[in-house]
């Protein structure tokens, strides 16, 4: 938006430039279609406006400093992004402005904070709560509407036309399913495939091939070779770095402090295990004996000589 001051011609060149120009159409307001005699003229996209005519088309609020122009209409910032933003809220289907607080999923779904509700019961979904994501219908729902597990001995067959009703805390009645709606087991597998984590969202329980609910940890962190070289070099000098030292390495490697902390804990545990293993083998070697087969705690056996020899060497370190 350009603000021009209308004043008498003061130079010959301006007189020459004005020859052949239709001043009536040039100084006519594009909004009210009236002639502009004001001292100041607002110019947008080669159109002139009265100062009082520059206001939002939707809310009619005056726009003195900044406005948005689209298809011949003037908008304030709020209504421009609401109607013409390239990013749309999956909940209310309205535009998202740069100042709005939103939840964004890796599938590309964006929700206003106030629109982040269960599509079935309308309950607001809080951060940290388990949710179901349907990126085809672009909806989210709470775990109350999670389909029941299917066992080999019981459960509705695939292609069933109904699903059981929700829990007593929900006011939603049983609703029919389309013929193409997947079975409960298929839904669980899709949740596993489309359970996206974003910010406070967490999906910890998923169904495996045997339809058992397993506790799944967070995504594994892949450490690149150059990052691993930095951590190994630091470990050789300081096996148990301070919090300040870990923070410096986090900035240097791009890894989070939590990842670095866990890496050092695992590395120290591995070093202790190797140390105890060497002592265990040396204990029998000094006596000219052949050590018995080594079994670790995750193997099924009644007694474990090596673990008894090592003691509790896997207890966690106290971090700063």
UniProtKB/Swiss-Prot annotation:
Q: What is the lineage of its organism?
A: Eukaryota, Metazoa, Ecdysozoa, Nematoda, Chromadorea
- DNA bind region: 216-275
Pfam families xref list: Homeodomain (PF00046), LIM (PF00412)
Note the superkingdom of the native organism. Eukaryota
Coiled-coil regions, chain positions: none
GO CC, sorted alphabetically, is: nucleus
Keyword Cell inner membrane listed: no
Listed InterPro entries: HD (IPR001356), Homeodomain-like_sf (IPR009057), LIM_Homeobox_TF (IPR050453), Znf_LIM (IPR001781)
Q: Which SMART domains match?
A: HOX, LIM
Q: What is the protein's known function?
A: Specifies differentiation of the set of six touch receptor neurons. Binds cooperatively as a heterodimer with unc-86 to sites in the mec-3 gene promoter.
Q: Which organism is it from?
A: Caenorhabditis remanei (Caenorhabditis vulgaris)
Protein name per Swiss-Prot or TrEMBL: Mechanosensory protein 3
Instruction: Kindly list the GO molecular function terms attached to this UniProt entry.
Output: DNA-binding transcription factor activity, RNA polymerase II-specific; metal ion binding; RNA polymerase II transcription regulatory region sequence-specific DNA binding
Q: Which GO terms describe its biological process?
A: neuron differentiation
Spell out the subcellular localization from the entry.
Nucleus
The UniProt keywords, alphabetically, are: Developmental protein, DNA-binding, Homeobox, LIM domain, Metal-binding, Nucleus, Repeat, Zinc
Write the gene name. mec-3
LIM zinc-binding domain span: 29-79, 89-145
């Amino acid at each position: 938006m350009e603000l021009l001051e209308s004043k008498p011609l003061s130079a010959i060149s301006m007189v020459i430039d004005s020859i052949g120009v239709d001043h009536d159409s040039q100084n006519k307001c594009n909004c009210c279609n009236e002639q502009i005699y004001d001292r100041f003229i607002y110019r947008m996209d080669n159109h002139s406006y009265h100062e009082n005519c520059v206001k939002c088309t939707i809310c009619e609020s005056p726009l003195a400093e900044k406005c948005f122009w689209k298809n011949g209409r003037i908008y304030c910032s709020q209504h421009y992004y609401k109607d013409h933003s390239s990013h749309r809220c999956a909940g209310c289907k309205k535009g998202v402005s740069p100042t709005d607080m939103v939840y964004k999923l890796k599938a590309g779904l964006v929700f206003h904070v106030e629109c982040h509700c269960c599509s079935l019961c309308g309950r607001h979904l809080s951060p940290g709560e388990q949710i179901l994501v349907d990126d085809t219908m672009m909806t989210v729902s709470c775990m109350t509407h999670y389909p029941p597990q299917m066992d080999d001995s019981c459960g509705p067959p695939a292609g069933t036309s109904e699903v059981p009703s929700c829990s007593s805390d929900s006011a939603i009645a049983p609703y029919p399913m389309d013929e193409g709606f997947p079975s409960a087991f298929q839904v669980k597998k899709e949740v596993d495939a489309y359970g996206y984590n974003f910010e406070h969202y967490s999906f910890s329980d998923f169904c495996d091939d045997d339809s058992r609910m397993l506790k799944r940890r967070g995504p594994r962190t892949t450490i690149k070779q150059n990052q691993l070289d930095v951590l190994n070099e630091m470990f050789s000098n300081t096996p148990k770095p301070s919090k300040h030292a870990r923070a410096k390495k986090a900035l240097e490697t791009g890894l989070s402090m939590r990842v670095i902390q866990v890496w050092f804990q695992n590395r120290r545990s591995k070093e202790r295990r190797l140390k105890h293993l060497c002592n265990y083998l040396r204990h029998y070697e000094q006596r000219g004996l052949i050590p018995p087969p080594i079994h670790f705690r995750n193997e099924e056996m009644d007694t474990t000589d090596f673990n008894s020899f090592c003691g509790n060497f896997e207890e966690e370190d106290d971090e700063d």
